[in-house]
């Protein structure tokens, strides 16, 4: 028998109807008002044919409209396929095709070829139809699909169930605690699992969310000072921006947690936070773990510099090398397990079998545990470039470069950047006449802006080992010598 729970938002609206759910700029919406908005969206989506079990793509920016669509799809029992608004049209079409979506709901102009596109504004101005609302959720059913890229650069749809999202929120509350006055400032895109997880916490905890539609460091800085924010999720770039604006001031003591993800933070940044009394909690997680799976509390932010902490209460973590669990201080692959971990990838049985074995997720990330069990992440999928908190996979950029008629070989690595942490740099072996400008322009047409290499260098040949595998470490050395 499948385990079920009451529809989360319906239950929250029943329990605390008049409590503020969402604040966006000057607009405030209670949980009951949010529920009523969602029912209306649900009825309009039902009229255009959205049904239980279907997969529906969502291409929207942060805002009340996106929140209501995500909840409305769960009300009708459809699976929300959340698309990154920063991707190119080609990338989006590929993901929609791969996910077998029946339609796209969006707040922007988009031609999806063979898939019906519904502008939310037009849908809401049209007729509505009584909807069959799911009053219970089965924890085993898929709620969302979010695309991530493996080391091959091929996107994979991570299936996250209601149970995964529930376990993630419970684990976070056991880790960070809950207070009646908690308010989480949400500035992460909701198409990322980190942003989406805040919507889950919002209705499960009954916690106020202050939603920032678009990243604005000045607004966020002021909000932390004046809007009663107690928790915020950030990456290093955001934290640096906030410290610059803070100057000699400090944030209110009510700000009890800065949850820092997107890779290890530099020690000077953490030391500055200690000086300012800012409690930074470093985290490690991924789409496959429904957001964080490890967190380093502020108590250890300087004594365990570089550590991602220990697993959440209901999660397990170990380090393996060649299939064998290794002792502390020995490097190996980070392997995790828990109720927040995905059961697999959509239509990727081989990748699922390779990645998840006996319930343990093989992350592909390298790290080690110290003698006290604190995790240190050494390399995120070894080749991964993390730029402003966004994951960039070199193989995807290389695939685009190799599609250019004048490119014979291509290799991409991360290059240090003061603003973004890292940006892509490309190395190309030419097969015909082509300039650096032409290469970069070609990439701009095929890739999201943040994935476009900031530099393209030409080589006679790329460094490879005896089995002809690309030696990225040598490319990184070339970047450092530039």
From Swiss-Prot:
Q: Which GO terms describe its molecular function?
A: ATP binding; CoA-ligase activity; o-succinylbenzoate-CoA ligase activity
Q: Which CDD domains match?
A: OSB_CoA_lg
**What are the protein's UniProt keywords?**
ATP-binding, Ligase, Menaquinone biosynthesis, Nucleotide-binding
EC numbers listed for it are: 6.2.1.26
Q: So what family is this one in?
A: Belongs to the ATP-dependent AMP-binding enzyme family. MenE subfamily.
| Top-level class of the enzyme under EC nomenclature | ligase
Gene behind this protein:
menE
Keyword Ligase appears in the UniProt entry: yes
Which pathway does the database say it acts in?
Quinol/quinone metabolism; 1,4-dihydroxy-2-naphthoate biosynthesis; 1,4-dihydroxy-2-naphthoate from chorismate: step 5/7; Quinol/quinone metabolism; menaquinone biosynthesis
User: Could you tell me which species this protein originates from?
Assistant: Bacillus cereus (strain ATCC 14579 / DSM 31 / CCUG 7414 / JCM 2152 / NBRC 15305 / NCIMB 9373 / NCTC 2599 / NRRL B-3711)
Q: Which cysteines are joined by disulfide bonds?
A: none
> Which Pfam families does the record match to this protein?
AMP-binding (PF00501), AMP-binding_C (PF13193)
Q: Name one GO biological process term.
A: menaquinone biosynthetic process
The reaction(s) annotated as catalysed by this protein in its Swiss-Prot or TrEMBL entry are: 2-succinylbenzoate + ATP + CoA = 2-succinylbenzoyl-CoA + AMP + diphosphate
Q: What is this protein called?
A: 2-succinylbenzoate--CoA ligase
Describe its function: Converts 2-succinylbenzoate (OSB) to 2-succinylbenzoyl-CoA (OSB-CoA).
